[in-house]
Amino acid sequence: MPWAGYARPIAPVLTAFAETAVVYDRFYSISSYTAMSIGGLLAGRYPSELDRSGHYFAHWGDVLFFPEMLRRAGVRTASAQSHFYFDQRSGFRPAFDVYEVVPGIEEDHQTVHGITSPAQLELGLKMLSDPATVKGRFFAWLHFLDPHDKYEAHAGIGPYGHTTRDLYDGEVTFTDQHVGKLLDFVAAQPWGARTVVIVSADHGEAFGEHQCFRHGFELWDVLTHVPFMIRAPGLAPRRIDTPRSAVDMAPTILDLFGLPKDPAMEGESLVPEMRGAAAPARDVVLDLPRTTNSDRRRALIRGDFKLVAIGDDDAFQLYDLRNDPGEEHDVQWTARAKLDEMKAAYRALSAKMPAVCPSSREKLRGKKSHRPC
């Protein structure tokens, strides 16, 4: 994105927003696949830990999501979505007082058809115009999906070019315009000045890096390094370079409402460091459970190094992100001490993060007969 050094000015609204916000320069999604990332974000846990279906990654009622905790504390919760997964299948609906999906969404498990930002904006503005939603404390989650394959050209934007990356950039600009209209609406409301606004994403996108396209099958930084910006009353704009993860989002939002996190949550509140406290170093964990589409991947980020575990820890890769941000050179053979340190830390962490088997027994690709998940 432009505020992170991308040369093409594809998101002027969010670039201006970054000047008024606390910006995390090394923020990671929990996974590289929407259902896993969002489930983990809402639960404050890793997707491997959550009871779920093995194919659609539907979450069952015993998974506690932080919006449900807000509801119990008297906070009104609302969500507007623009993909068929977020309808009945995801299991997120019961955590919200108001939960709506853009009508007419086509169900396709390979790609996304159509343009939804205008309808998503309309749905979000309707929710935020309802006095029942905004008369007291409220939490609203609006998920814009248009920067997503299938990439569409948009009239009046660019032209940036005709490659898939060019089309994707145009989709970012198109969505940025609609997010801008949403932010303008919020700013004009009587409650706007006392409202916290958070901007983030559930995964990145690959355009040929590591011979990968789209997302959801690996844990490269191009798939997991995402924006995280927060603007709040009394919060001075600043940049934070310490690695952090979306697993911290649930404890952070609960803290902003004055509520403690659930004991099962893995993340920590970022509120103290947002307010100026030092940001202590913490490991970041990425988790891509085995599914019907791909084998398991996990990764551990500690400082400038990233350890990737493949399958049931059958193989490892080690990258120096400061000197090799594109993760092109595996340094495990030349940095043996660092490899041993990272593997020990990873195994200790994995021992505390057991994998819950999917409740639906679809055959999982790469599943070994002696391994339940």
List the predicted regions and their residue ranges.
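Catalytic domains that recognize anionic headgroups
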Residues: M1-C373
